[in-house]
Amino acid sequence: MTLFILTETSAGYALLKAKDKKLLKRDDLATEASTAEGVSNLLKLKSFQKFDSATAALEEVASVVEGKVTPRLASLLDEIKDEKKVSLAVADPKLGNAIGKLPGLDISLIADSTTADIYRAIREHLPTLIPGLLPQDMSTMSLGLSHSLARHKLKFSPDKIDTMIVQAIGLLDDLDKELNNYAMRVKEWYGWHFPELAKILNDNIAYSRLVLKMGMRSNFENADLAEILPEEIEAAVKAAADRSMGTEISEDDLENIQALAEQVVGFSEYRSQLAGYITARMNAIAPNLTALVGDLVGARLIAHAGSLTNLSKSPASTLQILGAEKALFRALKTKHDTPKYGLIYHASLIGQATGKNKGKMARVLAAKASLGLRVDALAEWDDDVTEEDKAALGTEARFNLERKLAALEGKPLKPRGVAIGPDGASAQPGKFNINEARKYNPDADAVDQDKATPSKKMLVQEVQDEEMADADSDEEPAANGVDSDSSDEETSKKSKKSKGSEIEKLAEKAGLSVKRYKRKLERGEIQFDAAGNPSAISKKDIKKAKKEAKKEAKKASKGDDKEKKRKRSDETEDTDGKKKKKKRDD
């Protein structure tokens, strides 16, 4: 049986024919094939199919690795169809199974460990078996093909490098901390010279720019600050500079302060540039996630998970509480309620929701974000696909979530395409404004005075039913035309006033307000002496009285129990006596 050996190389497919039919069964195969002359004596080239380009080589080798037979390989195997009693040695068993399924190819396949020695010898001495193939060219082609194959396996793309996002968002957080520290140091340092400026101007960047431009506070009076400050704040700054209480500083001190202020301005400019870079990278790597939660929140989620692939493998429940691991494990340990959200809490959709709906929105948003993440991580797009098409899933999901949030909050539904701000209202990007710092208003101070609280009208009043007088009655109206009922009302009002004045006097004697006196009087906590002067019973006395009442109640209950026991014992004695009499009579 003729033996053929199929060899896949970086240059093409080679079909080798063994000169010895029992080559694989020889015991001295390894020693004889250790040299180039020995290999050339054992094998000869039957046919060679060369790859046309590097792209074709990548496609062919990738198909062979997956165990598929390409048209080029099938045409090479057609050359041994006509031969009878043919055996073919293949290095990959998966590829051997695929070749065995080809129609019209009646050959016996060998894809076991017996071919290991011969394939090792072929790889070592391949240039001697294929004429015109130099060792230098072979190594170059093998290196290029291995890189292309590895890139193909990893589906490598420069736009899919999520490491850049992880590093960038970490740098952004570090910049925020350093920028805040530097800005506070500038305010404290320059505050010795112009302390009023920090109270008027809140913005750190504008403060640093002002220090860089003006220097000494004496330069503020005739300077034009319209490029940095609005008119109102500019006037306030100039007025404060004229009557400032700060100390004088030297030019050397001012140079160092301005050097630090320059660092603050430079850091702020680089931070805005870095934020734009993160936005662009997030739109390229995870457009659906960016459409749902925003670029900064999405970047922090990717950085926390380690990579976009790891984040896409996480379920929605994990995505919802990502970043709150300490709180989660603490809640599980103490058997308390688990947290509802982690890093996703900072998304604008959750920020628009009120307290009762934040948990619902976090759960729904995490579910939609997990779907969008899988599309971002695993979808393969063509070159002609636009960015809008890539982010279509996230945009549609965000629109539906905004409508659901509006329905939960009871707000009117916004039409498609309307930007919704954190307060839930349609918003447009506004201009940057520097607001003046809030000041204490001394004119609003006032001395509290005792004001008589107006008596509240009773919502329900009692009305007494009175009998109507007959028409033929002899009663005549009063001379002034006023009925006798009016006089009764006047007398009742006078009596009420007199009662109210008496209660006020008694409350003053007891040292209580009228309200407290009435409450204590209703509870029975007011006692009167022999002269009729009231006094409030202290809480200690009330507690003692309650304890004594409880003790008396317990004693009474114990006495009742004793009487009941005595009655029972008397009854039992009577019944026993009756039984004894009956026995005597009998």
From Swiss-Prot:
GO MF term set: snoRNA binding; snRNA binding
Nucleus keyword on record: yes
Annotated spans, Disordered: 464-586
Main localization, broad class: nucleus
GO BP terms, alphabetized: box C/D sno(s)RNA 3'-end processing; endonucleolytic cleavage in 5'-ETS of tricistronic rRNA transcript (SSU-rRNA, 5.8S rRNA, LSU-rRNA); endonucleolytic cleavage in ITS1 to separate SSU-rRNA from 5.8S rRNA and LSU-rRNA from tricistronic rRNA transcript (SSU-rRNA, 5.8S rRNA, LSU-rRNA); endonucleolytic cleavage to generate mature 5'-end of SSU-rRNA from (SSU-rRNA, 5.8S rRNA, LSU-rRNA); protein localization to nucleolus; snoRNA guided rRNA 2'-O-methylation
SMART domains referenced in this protein's UniProt entry, alphabetically: NOSIC (SM00931)
Compartment(s) of residence: Nucleus, Nucleolus
Database matches in InterPro entries: Nop56/Nop58 (IPR045056), NOP58/56_N (IPR012974), Nop_C (IPR042239), Nop_dom (IPR002687), Nop_dom_sf (IPR036070), NOSIC (IPR012976)
Keyword Transport: no
Alphabetical keyword list: Nucleus, Ribonucleoprotein, Ribosome biogenesis, rRNA processing
A single Gene Ontology CC term: nucleolus
Domain Nop: 285-410
Biased composition (Acidic residues): 464-477
Domain of life: Eukaryota
Biased composition annotated in UniProt, kind: Basic and acidic residues: 499-508, 549-563
Function: Required for pre-18S rRNA processing. May bind microtubules.
Protein family per UniProt: Belongs to the NOP5/NOP56 family.
PANTHER family noted in UniProt: NUCLEOLAR PROTEIN 5 NUCLEOLAR PROTEIN NOP5 NOP58, NUCLEOLAR PROTEIN 58
Name of the protein in its database record: Nucleolar protein 58
Species: Emericella nidulans (strain FGSC A4 / ATCC 38163 / CBS 112.46 / NRRL 194 / M139)
Species lineage: Eukaryota, Fungi, Dikarya, Ascomycota, Pezizomycotina
Encoding gene, per UniProt annotation: nop58
